[in-house]
Amino acid sequence: MSTVLVRRKERRQPPQMPRGEILLESPPELPEVVTNSFQNVLMYLPMAAGSAAMVFTFLNHRNTLQLVAGGMFALSMFGMMFGQLSQQSGERKTKLNSARRDYLRYLGQVRQRVRKAAKQQREALEWNNPAPGRLWSMVMSPRLWERRSSDADFAQVRIGAGPQRLAVQLIPPETKPVEDLEPMSAGALRRFLRAHSTVPDLPVAISLRSFARILPDGDPKAVYGMVRALIMQLAAFHSPDDVRITVCASRERMPQWQWMKWLPHSLHPTEYDAAGQVRLLTHSLVELESMLGPEIKDRGMFGASRAPAEPFHLVIVDGGQASYDSQIASDGIDGVCVIDLTGSVAETNEATMLRLRVTPERVYVVKRDRAGKEVLSSVGRPDQASIAEAEALARQLAPFRTSAADEPEEDVLSANMTLTSLLHIDNPYNLDPAVLWRPRPQRNRLRVPIGLDADGRPLELDIKESAQGGMGPHGLCIGATGSGKSELLRTLVLALAMTHSPEVLNFVLVDFKGGATFLGMEGLRHVSAIITNLEEELPLVDRMYDALHGEMVRRQEHLRHSGNYASLRDYEKARMEGAPLPPMPTLFIVLDEFSELLSAKPDFAELFVMIGRLGRSLGVHLLLASQRLEEGKLRGLDTHLSYRIGLRTFSAMESRVVLGVPDAYELPPSPGNGYLKFATEPLVRFKAAYVSGPVDEEPQTRSEGPQIVRQVLPYLTDYIRPQVVEQPQPEQRAEENKSSESLFDVVVRQLAGHGPEPHQIWLPPLDVPPTLDELLPPLSPSAAHGYTADGWEWRGRLHAVVGLVDRPFDQRRDPYWLDLSGGAGHVGVAGGPQTGKSTMLRTLITSLALLHTPQEVQFYCLDFGGGTLAGLAELPHVGSVATRLDADRIRRTVAEVSALLEQREQEFTERGIDSMATYRRLRATGEYAGDGFGDVFLVVDNWLTLRQDYEALEDSITQLAARGLGYGIHVVLSSNKWSEFRTSIRDLLGTKLELRLGDPYESEVDRKKAANVPENRPGRGLTRDGYHFLTALPRIDGDTSAETLTEGIATTVKTIREAWHGPTAPPVRMLPNVLPAAQLPSAAESGTRIPIGIDEDSLSPVYLDFNTDPHFLVFGDTECGKSNLLRLITAGIIERYTPQQARLIFIDYSRSLLDVATTEHQIGYAASSTAASSLVRDIKGAMEARLPPPDLTPEQLRSRSWWTGAELFLVVDDYEMVATSDNPLRPLAELLPQARDIGLHLIIARSMGGAGRALYEPIIQRIKEMASPGLVMSGNKDEGILLGNVKPHKLPQGRGYFVERRSGTRLIQTAYRES
């Protein structure tokens, strides 16, 4: 049998017994009779004398008329005398009647006072000693077991009802002798005193503590009925801890007492048998004494102690074996009263005995006079209770037990009560959810105890709407720090979880500050969401707004689509009637620290109002909790908050805002004390239950040695021996201190995992990035397509997944798919530093690589973001990855893609290909082999760096973006902010991925939402639609750790590479470090043009055409390849011209060109200034002879027919050594402008040192002014711009910038010619 713990409250004050006295007034007295005859005679004598004289006067005349007149005079005289006497008598009677009336009226007023006092006296006595028929109602009231051993009326029991003196003393007046009193008034006084001095049928009680033995006799039925009534009152008002009621009866009479086995007062406190606690009903006093043991063994004689022993024992002896050496059969035991129904116990001390004679109508107290004769004193009518009535009361009391924390002298609200005690759960370690979650009556639905009220009764919070008998669906809880608010919320949520299944009730638990209020509840299947730590992550508040708003909409749509139900109540009613509808649990939202939430996000109040308005019908209940509540915070919401809980507040004003009174401010400081207010009911004071305290150690289900076998047995009074079996040695339990676990932890662990999974209202925030294998269809190797999602419909269609999109309103997270097949084919990624831009690019590349073959997509990467893209270089889809310092590869990459664009523009036109979609289709079907490329992606990580360091490439990439999309050329760019892209290219980026920006104001999605993208969360960003997303990790091993990302990418690249056996992405062709001269076009292929190398853009030959541009300049550091270039040019001249066509003169102070010309082409070689001057004079003379005369025709100028001879090539090496103050070449300066006409060519190579100043040297200045081609090789950038707009910088040997007026500036690699 389950038990119910009773925490006894402070005893209520009974009705007051009237006190005092009433002094009655004396009745009126009879008036005294006045006997003044002589005075009356004297008063009437003159009248009589006069009348007699008149009579005698008329009689003397003996006339008849006169005789009549005399008689009339005599008659009138006697009439006057009689009238006077009558008048005096009437006045006396009138006064006496008035006095009588006044006295009777006075007695009537006193009678009202006396009757009121009698009523109060009856109420007071019946409060303390109710009739047996009313005791059943006391069991379910706060008065159960209200009397404590320290109370004056402890162990006082009613035995019947009889007359008693009026509590207000009626004091009769002192009067004259009765014969002097007005008879009627005196009689009324006597009757008044006789009627009201006693009050009939008042409860008659005896104190069991005052007697060692009570011996009732008389009519057996009446005796048993009275004793049963006596026991019933004793059991109803006294707890089992204070009173024991035991029976010693013969077997024949034991059936009279079988009902007492249900009384908790008749159960042994520590001994158990097979049926439970041993029943204290025996057949002998010796056996009873052995069962009671020390409780009575060590007690003294009756009355020896001034403080009675506890607990008090009432022993009923009805036959049985009463041994004379029994302690109970002695003269009396302290704190023990024996009711002997059969005289089985020897009579000893008459002074401590009470004899009663009981008849069906009267009960008498029996005493003996000195002669030993019985003297009977009636006390009233005996109480009677049948066995059925007694057993009914006993069964009511059977489950109740006193709480161990009961402190009679203390306020019931001062102790802690566990939730399991309120729910009548004995062992929290052995919970059965199937039993706990059994269907509950509608009255108990959403109704749970949360603590004890001031009367010690469980206080239940009912969050149903008032129309269903509840307190309302929405409430408010305010409590200062240390008031126990968090504990109350935990208690409420845990109580609801223990009594309602997840099919009936779900929770959304929100803690704005991120405290531990709801910590540990994640395992409950009731919990749809636990949201904490919003204070530090305010963007999550908006996410919660969307989630809760979405849940309201979802419920509305579900009710409408399921059958257009008006409310959840109608929906559940249809389910119960058999409609095939899924469960739709009630949702209870508990929000702690809501006041601070509203301070941070005032707009959230609109959602609260919406829930308050629609939640009743949708089954969404709301409890708002906070430490403080400012006036005005609840504006618009307070009308929806039907119940309010006020724990101890910081101020009286806060208490008034919540409860309307300042009482919550005056609560004691101990946690859990509070007030509950709902509807128009008065405030209810309560103490919340405690669930965070340690729970008793889990009871051992198996132990070493004998174990009692559980059986189903009849519940009898006799001892039932348990069936014992031997148990094997138990396994050694792990050393675990169960007492360190809290009740909360134990219950949550017991309930975790039971019930259906709840609907997820709040998905976890985007904190843990997914991996690509989690977002893509199943991946596997394919012979035709490599490692991919083979067979998936979107494979190979330029779709890529790059992350997860958070849709809190829809309560789901979707893969973030990009469609790059159409106008959104260019991608821009913007985000502040360390926001995950490079990872986004890697994810995009990897995702496309997993869904396309290397023949379908190719990637060419410019990595200015720290080298992270280098990890993808081994992908078969990646043609090149160039880092910031790899300038050659960067330029070549852009040049290659640009060349591909130009090639496709030409091919598409020639072959009639109208779009890239057609091109893809033709390649896929094999109708067109193509150019070896598919969709080509030029990826630039950190666009600003490219603009700053490679400004010339910006225009090229802009052109690629403007023209390339229609030809399968895509650009993917990243930057720190959108403003770093010029408008010309930013508008072309059809797919924009916006990560966290340094300044949300620059967002191109939504500035307000951009501010909510969390900081220090790489990969978080906004979609075009304003949804938050999280970038996926570019790996396929399921590992979300950032620490192992490099290894994960390497594994992914290796997996993709090993699964592909076809051609890979064409690599970027680079300028060779060494270009053999033999690879240049021959004279037959190039004519008179002299090839000196190949350019970077197209890797095509670069020529010097001296017919067009007669001069050539070379600037370069030592050992950069200047002399090699001069040898190469010289060899080209010799190869293309005969000695008759061209002659060579060398000025070479360092003698590096001694062996260059071994043919007849060389006509001069100067290694010194003197030799050079001599040669220059000769050259000048020869050239001046070729100057055109003034009369030449245009045709002659074009054909140069006015002179004959060879072209003269003057080759100068180390010009810085030549161009001194006595420059031997200076005389030629005036001939340079006409050099083309006269066949003079200067080829000058100069060191880079001082080249900036050398530009103003006359010969170089004149050549530069003529826009002659030149080559700037490796040098120091401090020299400034030398040719065109080229500043020198470090370059490999043989490499330089070829500056020409027609083709602009090109980077070329000059050919190497072996000496």
Swiss-Prot record:
Question: Compositional bias (Basic residues) spans?
Answer: 1-11
Q: Which residues lie on this side of the membrane: Cytoplasmic?
A: 1-40, 86-1315
Residues annotated to bind ATP 2: 834-839, 1031
Annotated residues for binding of ATP 1: 479-486
Task: Output the superkingdom of the source species.
Answer: Bacteria
Outline the subunit composition: The cytosolic domain can form homodimers. Binds EsxB, which leads to multimerization, however EsxA disassembles the multimers, possibly by making EccC-EsxA-EsxB trimers instead of EccC-EsxB-EsxB-EccC tetramers. Forms a complex with EsxA and EsxB, probably wholly mediated by EsxB.
This chain belongs to the protein called ESX secretion system protein EccC
State the organism of origin.
Answer: Thermomonospora curvata (strain ATCC 19995 / DSM 43183 / JCM 3096 / KCTC 9072 / NBRC 15933 / NCIMB 10081 / Henssen B9)
Chain's gene name:
eccC
